[in-house]
């Protein structure tokens, strides 16, 4: 069942608009979580809804999230800041601050750990850790009456795309749409969305009808690590199951419906100053995590998302008229190793549990005769050496950890904090960057670990799948880094540009479309002149 209010279902498309010489009054920035270039390429020829329409804009099908830590928070932090994580401070979804006083040393990217009693899992949502302005922040500096509205399926997506001063920010908190803005007056559209979603979740969901394109992919695949088989699901859901609601096409429909309601209620795009709407569509990521990218489940998700995007654009045609859309993704993703192995991917495997920081730390403690937590982190990415050690002991632990990780057959590279600090921010196109250059753009000396571990290509860093996640992202490899970028505005010609541009290029490009001043030296991206209406100034 599609979750679209009557007001959206009645929104018919208007005739194609002529090319406008004036800047648009509404910028719509959409992130489709985990929409890799690979998935985009696979489905683009068969999609005839929203993606087909946006595809008649300027399409960069193989753009990049240049950094190594290809996770949701870092990815969203680049889209509307124009800055790498090394500049904006969002190096991962979670990092560690071993000097903080609370017992939980982990730090969630979109929390304010200064709040008493908070933890990295029971946190106060905040943009506290984002070090740079977003597009919405820049808009308010130049046009104080400009409004920024954010809607997303994840709090970190909403926060990182809307920045410090949004007028409305709403995200799914696991139960309903919530906000972190103090003393916020809840719009009627949010009240309606909450009621509609609660009623939707309370009803069971029968399996979706599967067209031939998707049913051809419906092969059951056993999953290692204790998880349930995947591949032939059709999003059957019991009444009240909000977890499966989130990992289904229903979720993006609800997010877009709320976004449309706020556009109408707030009359976005109808004032003198340009407005910004950011939309974080998270279902593709949850579907990829639970089922992988090559089964019937992802096929049904992509077809549904295409249809819902088409409805949303038709609504904007009627409600706003002249607007511009930029669509991209926070990161890519890959399929489950079991299905990849069957397809002939020789190196596809699940990570060795011995690589987790906790397990490795215990092994090193036994070897070195040291007690306590020696290592903090996951089974890849930033690893931190415990602080409760004498300098000589810490040096021994670091040396032993580096040797152990580097010797492991699933590890491609290990770079120390010192190595990364000495490495220059890369120039040139991101498809040519070395691994250490990719890691450098994810490095912040005040937040990064003592060293970073990069796994070999096609290693899936999930060993235990009993919790429901069977696949993930986060690597420095191109299947996780490559994403599409689409710029669209009514009346401009279609253009596909197969160049390795980056998501950090979006901010300066949009700024060039609307005449927005961006301080020199404050960003890492560059203006993309093929984008519709972008007047790029070369210095």
Specify the residue positions occupied by each region the protein language model found.
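N-terminal signal peptide c-region/cleavage motif recognized by signal peptidases
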Residues: 13-16
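Beta-strand elements within well-structured catalytic alpha/beta cores of enzymes
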Residues: 24-36, 53-54, 79, 139, ...
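Non-catalytic, well-ordered alpha-helical segments in soluble enzyme domains
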Residues: 37, 52-53, 132-141, 380-415, ...
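Short, structured active-site-proximal loop/turn typified by the sulfatase FGly-forming signature C/S-X-P-X-R
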Residues: 41-88, 145-151
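Short, solvent-exposed turn/loop segments enriched in Gly/Ser/Thr/Pro and often Arg
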Residues: 60-80, 150-160, 280-282, 324, ...
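Secreted, luminal/periplasmic, and some membrane-associated catalytic domains
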Residues: 62, 69, 93-124, 164, ...
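His/Asp/Glu-rich, glycine-adjacent segments
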Residues: 84, 90-273, 282-289, 407-409, ...
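Substrate-binding rim/cap in mid-to-C-terminal beta-strand-loop elements of soluble/periplasmic
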Residues: 342, 346, 350-395, 470-514, ...
């Amino acid at each position: 069942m599609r979750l679209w209010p009557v007001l959206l279902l009645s929104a018919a498309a208007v005739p194609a608009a002529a090319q406008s010489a004036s800047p648009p009054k509404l910028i719509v920035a959409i992130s489709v979580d985990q929409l890799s270039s690979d998935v985009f390429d696979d489905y683009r020829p068969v999609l005839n809804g929203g993606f087909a329409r946006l595809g008649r804009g300027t399409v960069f099908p193989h753009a990049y999230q240049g950094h190594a830590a290809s996770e949701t928070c870092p990815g969203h932090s680049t889209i509307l800041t124009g800055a790498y994580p090394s500049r904006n401070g969002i190096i991962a979804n979670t990092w560690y601050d071993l000097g903080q006083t609370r017992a939980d040393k982990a730090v969630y990217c979109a929390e304010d750990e200064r709040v008493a009693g908070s933890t990295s899992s029971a946190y106060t949502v905040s943009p506290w850790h984002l070090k740079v302005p977003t597009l919405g922040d820049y808009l308010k500096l130049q046009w104080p009456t400009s409004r920024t509205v954010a809607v997303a399926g994840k709090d970190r997506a909403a926060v990182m795309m809307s920045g410090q001063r949004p007028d409305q920010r709403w995200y799914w908190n696991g139960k309903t749409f919530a906000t972190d803005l103090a003393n916020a007056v809840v719009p009627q559209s949010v009240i309606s969305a909450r009621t509609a979603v609660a009623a939707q979740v309370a009803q069971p969901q029968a399996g979706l009808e599967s067209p031939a394109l998707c049913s051809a992919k419906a092969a059951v695949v056993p999953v290692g690590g204790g998880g349930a088989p995947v591949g032939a699901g059709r999003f059957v859901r019991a009444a009240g199951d909000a977890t499966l609601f989130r990992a289904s096409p229903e979720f993006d429909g609800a997010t877009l419906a709320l976004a449309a309601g706020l556009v109408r209620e707030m009359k976005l795009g109808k004032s003198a100053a340009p407005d910004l709407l950011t939309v974080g569509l998270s279902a593709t990521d949850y579907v990829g995590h639970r089922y992988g990218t090559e089964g019937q489940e992802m096929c049904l998700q992509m077809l549904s998302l295409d249809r819902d995007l088409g409805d949303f654009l038709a609504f904007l045609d009627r409600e706003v008229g002249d607007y511009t859309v930029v669509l991209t993704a926070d990161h890519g993703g890959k399929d489950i190793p079991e299905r990849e192995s069957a397809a002939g991917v020789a190196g596809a495997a699940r990570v060795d549990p011995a690589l987790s920081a906790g397990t490795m730390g215990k092994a090193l403690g036994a070897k070195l005769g040291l007690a306590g937590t020696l290592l903090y982190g996951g089974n890849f990415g930033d690893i931190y050496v415990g602080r409760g050690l004498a300098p000589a002991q810490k040096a021994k632990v670091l040396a032993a950890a580096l040797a152990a990780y580097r010797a492991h057959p699933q590890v491609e590279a290990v770079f120390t904090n010192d190595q990364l600090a000495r490495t220059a921010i890369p120039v040139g196109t991101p498809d040519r960057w070395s691994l250490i250059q990719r890691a450098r753009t994810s490095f912040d000396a005040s937040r990064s670990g003592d060293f970073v571990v990069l796994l070999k290509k096609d290693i899936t860093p999930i060993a235990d799948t009993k919790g429901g996640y069977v696949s993930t992202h986060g690597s420095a490899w191109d299947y996780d880094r490559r994403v599409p970028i689409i710029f669209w505005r009514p009346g401009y010609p279609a253009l596909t540009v197969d160049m390795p541009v980056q998501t950090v290029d979006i901010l300066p490009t949009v700024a060039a479309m609307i005449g927005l001043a961006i301080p020199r030296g404050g960003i890492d991206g560059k203006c993309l002149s093929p984008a519709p209406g972008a007047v790029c100034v070369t210095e």
